[in-house]
């Protein structure tokens, strides 16, 4: 499963770990995703993976 928000499309960001000796290794910061039941229609609900910023901003309506 991809680490991508199904509402805004936000995905992981990539960067570097840098130690005190300045050794550099690649790393990634994942999105804070939560499985949420969302209202799709008047009677239908769907479970989607949504980032917490979309939940806080009210872009979805929970079922």
Swiss-Prot record:
The keyword Ribonucleoprotein applies. HAMAP family: Ribosomal_bL28. Coiled coil: none annotated. This is Large ribosomal subunit protein bL28. GO terms for cellular component: ribonucleoprotein complex; ribosome. It comes from Acidobacterium capsulatum (strain ATCC 51196 / DSM 11244 / BCRC 80197 / JCM 7670 / NBRC 15755 / NCIMB 13165 / 161). Belongs to the bacterial ribosomal protein bL28 family. Pfam families: Ribosomal_L28. The keyword Ribonucleoprotein applies. Keywords: Ribonucleoprotein, Ribosomal protein.
